[in-house]
Amino acid sequence: MRSRHSPSNRHRFRLFASLAPALAGFALLLFGSAAGAVDPDSVFHIDRNKNRNQVHYGVHLDQDCRPAGPEPVYNYWLRREEEPPVVRPLTYFQQTAYGFQKQKIENDGRIEVRLRALPDRQLVVRVAAVGGACKAETFMTIDGKQAYLDKVFVFAEEGYFVPAVRYIELYGRSNDGVAVYEKINVGD
C-alpha cells in the first residue's frame, strides 16, 4: 500500500520533466562545454527498442552562436530507465555504435556530420541566433525529401557479442511542417 506521501509515477515524471532543462545544462557542464558558451538543448536523439534510454546529440556554441571547437557536436545518454533519470557520457564501446564518423564545419557555420549509426547519410546541423538565443536544428534527407530530423529509432535484436540492427526509422518534418518518415531495413 502506497502512503499518501509517496510519489506516484506520474508525479515522478512531472518532476523529471521539470528538471530536464537543468539536467541538460548539467550535462553540458559535465562534458566540457566551453566557458561562456550558449549550448542549445538536444538537436535530435536516438530511441531504441531495448529500453527507454536515449542517445542525445547537442552542439557546443560560442556566445555568437557559432560552432565552438573543431568537433562541436557531442552525444550523451539520457538514462530514463534509472530512478531518477540521469545524464551520462557514452562509453568507448557505445561510441563505436552511436559516435561520429566525421564532423566538418563549413565556412557558413553549418556542421556536416556522419554518424556511425547512419554512415551513408549526411546530417547538417544549422545554427542561428533567434530572439537573442541560439537555435540549432538538424537536417537530412528523409524518404527522398530534405527535412528537419526530430529523432531516429533503432530496432535491434540481441546477438552473440553485439546486438544485430534490423531496421532504422527516421522521423522528421518538411519545411512546411508535414511529417516525414523513412524505414531503412538493415538486417536479413
Regions found by a protein language model. Give the residues of each.
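N-terminal secretory signal peptides that target proteins for export/translocation
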Residues: 1-17
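Bacterial N-terminal signal peptides
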Residues: 18-31
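N-terminal export/targeting and maturation segments
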Residues: 35-91
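Hydrophobic beta-strand residues in large extracellular and virion-surface proteins
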Residues: 46, 113-115, 123-125, 168-170, ...
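Mature extracytoplasmic domains of secretory-pathway proteins
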Residues: 77-147
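Beta-sandwich interaction modules
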Residues: 145-159
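Short, exposed beta-strand-loop hairpins at the edges of beta-sheets
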Residues: 159-183
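Short, solvent-exposed mixed-charge patches
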Residues: 186-188
